[in-house]
Amino acid sequence: SVGFKAGVKDYKLTYYTPEYETLDTDILAAFRVSPQPGVPPEEAGAAVAAESSTGTWTTVWTDGLTSLDRYKGRCYHIEPVAGEENQYICYVAYPLDLFEEGSVTNMFTSIVGNVFGFKALRALRLEDLRIPVAYVKTFLGPPHGIQVERDKLNKYGRPLLGCTIKPKLGLSAKNYGRAVYECLRGGLDFTKDDENVNSQPFMRWRDRFLFCAEAIYKSQAETGEIKGHYLNATAGTCEEMIKRAVFARELGVPIVMHDYLTGGFTANTSLAHYCRDNGLLLHIHRAMHAVIDRQKNHGMHFRVLAKALRLSGGDHIHAGTVVGKLEGEREITLGFVDLLRDDFTEKDRSRGIYFTQSWVSTPGVLPVASGGIHVWHMPALTEIFGDDSVLQFGGGTLGHPWGNAPGAVANRVALEACVQARNEGRDLAREGNTIIREACKWSPELAAACEVWKEIKFEFQAMDTI
């Protein structure tokens, strides 16, 4: 007789194991599974476990050459999603042996690879991952982290302020550097290259780096504060990216920037290693994230991309605002903000956190609030994000009627007023507008900003109901 039974068999016979007790070394995943009509949830969950680990669609004789029990993913728990018809959260455990050490790329290729095109599922979304400490320890993580960044910048007890230079495309390098100088001189801590500023014909990267470095040093000398500009090192090849980072280091600037999703995790991890070795901070922009995370039934939740970034490495990452033009629901946003900053996060389904996660002292990442925010939002932002954050006002600085430097002054005054009020025990949520109005009395720059933006609101239905 043949040594194995050929043919197609149900995934659930091998990969659905409700009695399995998860190991501390397993990578755990929570998938939101929408099976095709007629496909039972156990089969759908088992199919996800199989296709993202050792399985294939039919029995193969080479299965006999290995121990499936040792290497297979297991769907160990399934629960229906309240309020949704035929949708389930399927929990899958993956043995650690399946993954290459220190490679986010390999982890994602397995867990969110082919399985997302699987025909038995209408849709599939990865909601959360539990990264075991044994795997966390194979990554360097953020180049420096929150505490080291504060020590490098000598800035404590308040959020940091940034500004994206606009118009994002079309300025010459010298005019760009001038805008950087004005913002930093006015009182911001950082300015930022837009994510799509790389090295275009109207402004090559080397010219931009030089003029921005000049702006940094001039504003530092005049204000006595340490300043930075996120020089975007993202490039078409990894070699070119590192070349740009090397030039930034030679200029002596404090921070560079990378678009980690369009650039890719392999490139990002290389850059993070370079930044740690050379004392550069690394600002991460999440361009392309909404392609992956915006639909609630398919793709990947941003909290997974945030965890992946903390492993791959970055000191800042954009994380939504809760209040501006880009969406983000408060509790869910705060859930992944805590995942970025804290060393230990408890499971809390109300905040979208499916697993308890320990980071074994991997440095934290500063969340960046950016997108359609202005001075009237300052009390809410200070309250929601706390001190360990970067608040970035692009149009909210450069749109000031008197120019860039007064725009920066307005933001800095508003921030200092909110921090002082909070430290005095006032309630920012209730008294926010009053605090800003009081500060307007002694800051004409802030008063002018408040007048311009008093009516602006970005209020639409939440998008992820599609």
From Swiss-Prot:
What stretch or stretches form a coiled coil here?
A: none
| Gene Ontology molecular function terms on file | magnesium ion binding; monooxygenase activity; ribulose-bisphosphate carboxylase activity
Q: What reaction gets catalysed by this protein? A: 2 (2R)-3-phosphoglycerate + 2 H(+) = D-ribulose 1,5-bisphosphate + CO2 + H2O; D-ribulose 1,5-bisphosphate + O2 = 2-phosphoglycolate + (2R)-3-phosphoglycerate + 2 H(+)
| Required cofactor names | Mg(2+)
Q: According to its UniProt entry, what is the function of this protein?
A: RuBisCO catalyzes two reactions: the carboxylation of D-ribulose 1,5-bisphosphate, the primary event in carbon dioxide fixation, as well as the oxidative fragmentation of the pentose substrate in the photorespiration process. Both reactions occur simultaneously and in competition at the same active site.
Q: Which residues bind substrate?
A: 114, 164, 168, 286, 318, 370
* One protein family per Pfam: RuBisCO_large
Q: Could you tell me the Gene Ontology terms of the biological process aspect for this record?
A: photorespiration; reductive pentose-phosphate cycle
Cite the record's note on assembly. Answer: Heterohexadecamer of 8 large chains and 8 small chains; disulfide-linked. The disulfide link is formed within the large subunit homodimers.
Q: Keywords assigned by UniProt?
A: Calvin cycle, Carbon dioxide fixation, Chloroplast, Disulfide bond, Lyase, Magnesium, Metal-binding, Methylation, Monooxygenase, Oxidoreductase, Photorespiration, Photosynthesis, Plastid
Q: Which residues carry this modification: N6,N6,N6-trimethyllysine?
A: 5
What is the name listed in the Swiss-Prot or TrEMBL entry for this protein? Ribulose bisphosphate carboxylase large chain
Under which EC number(s) is this enzyme classified? Answer: 4.1.1.39
PTM note says: The disulfide bond which can form in the large chain dimeric partners within the hexadecamer appears to be associated with oxidative stress and protein turnover.
Q: CDD domains recorded for this chain? A: RuBisCO_large_I (cd08212)
Please give the organism: Silene gallica
Q: Which domain of life is it from?
A: Eukaryota
Site Transition state stabilizer: give positions.
Answer: 325
